[in-house]
Swiss-Prot record:
This is UDP-N-acetylmuramoyl-L-alanyl-D-glutamate--2,6-diaminopimelate ligase. Catalyzes the addition of meso-diaminopimelic acid to the nucleotide precursor UDP-N-acetylmuramoyl-L-alanyl-D-glutamate (UMAG) in the biosynthesis of bacterial cell-wall peptidoglycan. Meso-2,6-diaminopimelate binds at R383, D407, N408, P409, R410, G458, E462. ATP binds at G108, T109, N110, G111, K112, T113, T114. It catalyses: UDP-N-acetyl-alpha-D-muramoyl-L-alanyl-D-glutamate + meso-2,6-diaminopimelate + ATP = UDP-N-acetyl-alpha-D-muramoyl-L-alanyl-gamma-D-glutamyl-meso-2,6-diaminopimelate + ADP + phosphate + H(+). A motif (Meso-diaminopimelate recognition motif) lies at residues 407-410. One of its GO terms (molecular function) is magnesium ion binding. UDP-N-acetyl-alpha-D-muramoyl-L-alanyl-D-glutamate binds at S30, N149, T150, T151, S177, Q183, R185. Signal peptide: none annotated.
Length: 491
């Protein structure tokens, strides 16, 4: 594509976009530059891409997008916001793929991964080819691709959408993080349905206040647009029980569909019964009432199912079809996932890494636990420190046997992170500390007896642990299974 044509995606810039320059690819990482690359300088939190402009030129960059003045031998086109420019250029370069896809964006503190998987499965079982982008991976049809962030950078995102189209995908479902919204990674993406799950404390190391965090989430709904095309209306699916839904509704001109348990909603649940094997409830919808029996456990699972069914309805999938799918799904990896190696007590691995999600899971366990509740819990390093004492207090308040341990300490001292947690439980003697996560899991398993429940919280599906600069193999589910088998004399 000619540079002059590509720059049509940016309404205002300074510099000369030559019609003679051919652009073969776009990159923001100088290590990926090849001859014919348009290099975009991003001034990031850790690295400033402007410092690598010379290197990009040496590797074959034919032009550069920048915010700061550069002295290089190729044309430089200056923009006000490189991140926004990159997203718009990526969309244009890859042929505006989301205009040809049905695109669902799901945001919120908790539930994004489960709901995205539920919706993707519902759409797939309705006969459509699907794509999925989220915390665990990117998925194009049946092909699984690794991902580094919940929401990839805009170049990767638009390339993925393009590849989805080429593979015959008609509907893409994606998790949209608050970081991605603030950083402009999803600019240029044409959403058909946007879903708001909930808002509770997380990422305040980045957003600083809950007000900023809520504003970040609302950006998805502002981006949803105001198309009133009856054949393809824009729809916002909102949690009626979360007060921040008012903000999301105010931010969009799209049609509104609501779900909830406490407040009146278009899709609501009542007569909820929770057991150690699943949940049952009565579902009220705009097209009738239904009795549901799902294999997922807890009120939070009911919310997730309500959101998935409401979203499917927004996609014009019959409610009865959506119900059939959600009733058949056992759950999502690392989300209230049971580890069974022959022991006589439940061991649950869950991604709950926020105060609200940990509280929800422990309250659910309390509904069926016969005796003691062990919780293995830590907090991530280089992340929101404010939630550490809250996580510890919830563990002490709702579990009989809290075990404080490491999560992904990253560059922080694991001991210091645990000390931050302990600040939330002054005077308590109910917890123990095992800094090594493997030791903490083995301690819980060795202590547990019939009728007890173990929750291993925080990492869920993750199969690694980040300690300093090292990424080591570590999977809570594998470690729990090994510990159980050793206890039972099977290993």
């Amino acid at each position: 594509m000619k540079l002059k044509e590509l720059m049509q995606a940016i309404p205002v810039y300074t510099g000369e976009a030559s019609a003679a320059i051919e652009v073969n690819q776009i990159a923001q990482d100088s290590r990926k530059v090849q001859p014919g690359t348009l290099f975009i300088c991003i001034d990031g939190e850790i690295v400033d891409g402007h410092q690598f402009a010379d290197r990009a030129v040496q590797l074959g960059a034919v032009a550069i997008i920048a915010e700061k003045q550069l002295d290089v031998s190729v044309p430089v086109l200056y923009v006000r916001d490189s991140k926004r420019a990159m997203a718009m250029l990526a969309d244009y370069f890859y042929g505006s793929p989301t205009q040809a896809l049905k695109l669902v964006g799901i945001t919120g503190t908790n539930g994004k991964t489960t709901v995205s998987h539920l919706v993707e499965q519902i759409v797939r079982e309705n006969g459509e080819q699907t794509g999925l982008i989220g915390t665990m991976y990117r998925k194009i049809g049946d092909e699984i691709l690794e991902t580094k962030n919940t929401t990839p950078d805009s170049l990767t995102l638009q390339e993925t959408f393009r590849d989805m189209l080429l593979s015959g995908v008609s509907t893409a479902v994606m998790e949209v993080s608050s970081h991605a919204l603030v950083q402009g990674r999803v600019y240029g993406s044409d959403y058909d349905v946007a879903v708001f799950m909930n808002l509770s404390q997380d990422h305040l190391d980045y957003h600083h206040t809950m007000e900023e965090y809520a504003y970040a989430k609302s950006l998805l709904f502002a981006q949803l647009g105001n198309s009133y095309n009856l054949s393809n209306p824009k729809i916002a699916v909102l949690n009626a029980d979360d007060k921040e839904s008012v903000r999301m509704q105010t931010a969009t001109a799209a049609h509104i569909i609501t779900f909830g348990i406490k407040e009146p909603a278009d899709f609501s649940a009542s007569n909820i019964q929770i057991t150690s094997h699943g949940s049952t409830f009565d579902l009220k919808t705009p097209v009738g009432d239904f009795a549901l029996k799902i294999k997922m456990i807890g009120n939070f699972s009911v919310y997730n199912v309500l959101a998935a069914i409401a979203t499917s309805f927004a996609l014009r999938i019959p409610v009865i079809n959506a119900i059939a799918t959600v009733e058949s799904i056992p759950g999502v990896k690392g989300r209230f996932e049971l580890v069974n190696a022959g022991q006589d007590f439940p061991v649950i691995v869950d991604y709950s890494h926020t105060p609200d999600s940990l509280l929800n899971v422990l309250q659910t366990i309390d509904e069926f636990a016969e005796k003691r509740v062990f919780v293995v819990v830590g907090c991530g390093g280089d992340r929101d420190k404010g939630k550490r004492p809250q996580m510890a207090k919830i563990a002490v308040d709702y579990a009989t046997n809290p075990i404080f341990t490491s999560d992904n300490p990253r560059s922080e001292d694991p001991h210091a992170i645990i000390e931050d947690m302990i600040q939330g439980v002054p005077g308590s003697d109910s917890y123990v500390v095992h800094e090594n996560r493997r030791d903490a899991i083995r301690y819980a398993v060795n202590m547990a007896e019939a009728g007890d429940v173990i929750l291993i919280a925080g990492k869920g599906h993750e199969d690694y642990q980040v300690i300093g600069d090292e990424v080591i193999d570590f999977d809570d589910r594998v470690e729990a299974r090994i510990a159980i088998e050793k206890k039972l004399g099977l290993a």
